Amino acid sequence: MTKLSVNINKFALLRNSRGTNHPDLVEVAEKCVKFGAQGITLHPRPDERHAKFSDLPLISKLVNSHSKIEFNIEGYPSERFISEVINTKPDQVTLVPDPPDALTSSFGWNCKEHNMFLKEVVKQFQSNKIRVSLFVSP
């Protein structure tokens, strides 16, 4: 069965552009779940212009308070990203090859070119019992 995971990054961008906690990401995620989402996705970028790494434990706590709701963290596997994901222990991590200055994710991994790098990164997440998904180019 197909499941819906809602990416709440644009709400984080709006919050950050206002310089306040409005909209509150925890409230947004709670409403998504209330209206039928089976997962919440966040993509913290190195510059934290959307989701912030400090959002991860807050959303994780919310997701863990619901049965059958998953948490997916997506992003480029930098050292900080890997560490934050392993500490948060989401259900899934989606690896995206976007450079730190990219406005949005516009292409996927070239698995042949990045084979060894991806194997090493995937192994780290799998050893921490985190399911891995890759954003790939056809």
What is each residue range found by the language model?
Residues 1-71, 76, 86-89:
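Conserved N-terminal beta1-alpha1 strand-loop-helix module at the mouth
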Residues 7-10, 37-38, 98-102, 120-125:
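A short alpha-helix capping/helix-coil boundary motif
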Residues 12-17, 101-107:
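A short acidic, helix-capping loop that chelates divalent metal ions and anchors anionic groups
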Residues 27, 80, 120, 138:
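Short Gly/charged-rich anion-binding patches and loops
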Residues 40-49, 70-78, 92-98, 105-115, ...:
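Catalytic beta/alpha-barrel core
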Residues 57-64, 119-129:
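Surface-exposed amphipathic alpha-helices with a cationic face
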